[in-house]
Regions:
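Glycine-rich beta-alpha junction loops
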Residues: 12-18, 64-66, 157
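Short, well-ordered secondary-structure micro-motifs
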Residues: 20-23, 71-72, 99, 163
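Short, solvent-exposed amphipathic alpha-helical segments in soluble enzyme
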Residues: 25-27, 71-83, 140-145, 166-167
Length: 178
C-alpha cells in the first residue's frame, strides 16, 4: 500500500547488469491502483473537531500522505476555514503553495524559523499523512508545550497512534472532506 512505502535499494552484480533479457510485454502494461478511501469513525472526528475548536495555538504538519491521498485541495479548503498554519515535512513539500498565507515551510531539523517556533509553542499538532520521523520532530524536541496534544490523520495504524495521539485512522482526502 502507498502508506507503507519506504526506501528501496536494488543491488545487482555487475555481470547481471550487463545481461539482456526478453521481458514479456505484460510487464510494461499500465497498472492503475484504485485507492480505497477509508473513512474514520464519526465519533473520533467529532472529538477531533472539539479539540481543534478548544485549541489556542494549533499547527498542521502536512506529510507525504497528503500527496498519496491527492488531498492538497482539501487541505487548502480546511486551512482556509480553520485558519490553522501549516508546516510541511520533506515528503509533504508542496502540500500548500509556497505563497499561501498559512504556509510556514519546512519543519524539523532543517525547518524554517517560523515553523520551528510555532511547533515549540503549539498546544495541538494535527499530523496529516506524516510518520513523525526524527528529521521532522527534531528527535521530539520540536514540540515543547507541556500540554501539547496530537491528532493524527493517517491510513497507517502505527503512524496514527504515534505520540499518544487521537487516532483518526483513514484516508486524508476523505477525512478532510468531512
Amino acid at each position: 500500500s502507498p502508506s507503507e512505502t519506504g526506501t528501496v535499494m536494488l543491488s545487482l552484480p555487475q555481470d547481471v547488469q550487463s545481461e539482456s533479457f526478453n521481458f514479456p510485454c505484460d510487464l510494461f502494461k499500465k497498472k492503475i491502483w484504485k485507492i480505497q478511501r477509508q473513512r474514520a469513525d464519526k465519533d473520533i472526528i467529532k472529538k477531533a473537531i472539539e479539540w481543534i475548536k478548544k485549541s489556542k495555538k494549533p499547527l498542521i504538519i502536512a506529510g507525504g500522505g497528503i500527496h498519496y491521498s491527492e488531498a492538497t485541495e482539501e487541505l487548502k479548503k480546511f486551512v482556509d476555514i480553520t485558519n490553522i498554519p501549516v508546516a510541511e515535512t520533506f515528503a509533504g513539500k508542496g502540500a500548500l503553495k509556497y505563497n499561501d498565507s498559512h504556509q510556514l515551510g519546512a519543519i524539523g531539523v532543517t525547518g524554517t524559523f517560523g515553523a520551528v517556533k510555532i511547533s515549540k509553542e503549539s498546544d495541538l499538532i494535527i499530523g496529516i499523512g506524516t510518520r513523525y520521523s526524527d528529521f521532522t520532530t527534531s528527535s521530539k524536541t520540536a514540540f515543547q508545550n507541556k500540554n501539547v496534544k496530537f491528532i493524527n490523520i493517517n491510513n497507517n495504524e502505527f503512524d496514527a497512534a504515534k505520540n499518544g495521539a487521537l487516532m483518526v485512522q483513514g484516508d486524508a482526502k476523505a477525512i478532510l472532506k468531512e
